[in-house]
Curated annotation (Swiss-Prot):
Residues at which Mg(2+) binds: 16, 51, 112
Residues the record marks as active site: 37
GO molecular function list: ATP binding; dethiobiotin synthase activity; magnesium ion binding
NCBIfam families linked: bioD
Main location: cytoplasm
Subcellular location: Cytoplasm
Keyword tags: ATP-binding, Biotin biosynthesis, Cytoplasm, Ligase, Magnesium, Metal-binding, Nucleotide-binding
GO terms for biological process, alphabetical: biotin biosynthetic process
Pfam family, one: AAA_26
Magnesium as UniProt keyword: yes
One GO CC term, this protein: cytosol
This protein's name: ATP-dependent dethiobiotin synthetase BioD
Gene: bioD
Length: 242
């Protein structure tokens, strides 16, 4: 298996934009990359305002929204609670099954979780349990502002305590007027966690286009560093299969 698991320090931090943008950039580079977000609350998968639709647009994958996100519900709650209130039972086995189905189409998948790693996810698992099953390197998306050092370092420590590899951090929503503080936060996160901050993605105000997002990702995220992970994972997978 290869790809990345995109998680965050909180909800509404920018995971979907980062996941979609990275997938779109890698697809432009010629990689057969897909996107997968198994559970979504707040919108049904087909809603153009929802994460599944945004992932499809930004990544440029041919996959239908309800295949990108097989389980979605309108109520904006933690996925486990939202599904329970809707009378739907979704297990870890279910979402892994759909993950394997997507791998029949793509060589690698960029998987987006929900909120942070300790979010109640399926009826029998937290987000981190799903990440542990996949064993993909993590990309942690975080806010660039006050409080982010604590939230980010704790997220990384939690991931490492569960045996997961953290490829890097991306600070999302960076404003030019705050860049001095953002840079200070970047340095502190790297010093305290031992994990590199691979990008400072700008704040997108109002409506934005796919082109704007992908160009920003190319300019502000260390794509070459992430590409090394994809190549290394592919090499390991090829070696293991021989």
């Amino acid at each position: 298996m290869s790809g990345f698991f995109i998680t965050a320090t909180d909800t509404e931090v920018g995971k979907t934009v980062v996941a979609g943008a990275l997938a779109g950039v890698f697809r432009e580079l010629g990689y057969n990359i897909g996107v997968y977000k198994p559970l979504q609350s707040g919108h049904v998968a087909s809603n153009p305002e929802g994460d599944a639709a945004r992932l499809k647009v930004l990544s440029g994958v041919p996959t239908k929204e309800d295949e990108i996100c097989p389980y979605s519900i309108e109520e904006p709650l933690a996925p486990r609670l939202a599904m329970k209130r809707a009378g739907r039972a979704v297990t870890l086995k279910d979402i892994i099954h759909h993950y394997n189905e997507r791998l029949k189409e793509f060589n690698s998948l960029f998987v987006e979780g929900a909120g942070g790693l300790a979010v109640p996810y399926t009826e029998d698992a937290l987000v981190i349990d799903f990440a542990k099953e996949l064993q993909l390197p993590l990309i942690v998306v975080a806010r660039p502002t006050l409080g982010t050092v604590n939230h980010t370092v704790l997220t990384i420590a939690y991931a490492k305590a569960h045996g997961l590899t953290v490829a890097g951090v991306i600070l999302s929503g960076c404003k030019e007027c705050e860049m001095e503080r953002v840079q200070e936060n970047k340095v502190m996160i790297e010093e305290l966690s031992g994990v590199p901050v691979l990008g400072l993605l700008p704040f997108f105000e109002g409506e934005f286009t796919k082109k704007e997002v992908l160009e920003s990702a190319k300019e502000y995220i260390m794509i070459s560093k992430l590409e090394e992970f994809i190549r290394n994972e592919s090499t390991v997978a090829h070696t293991s299969s021989n």
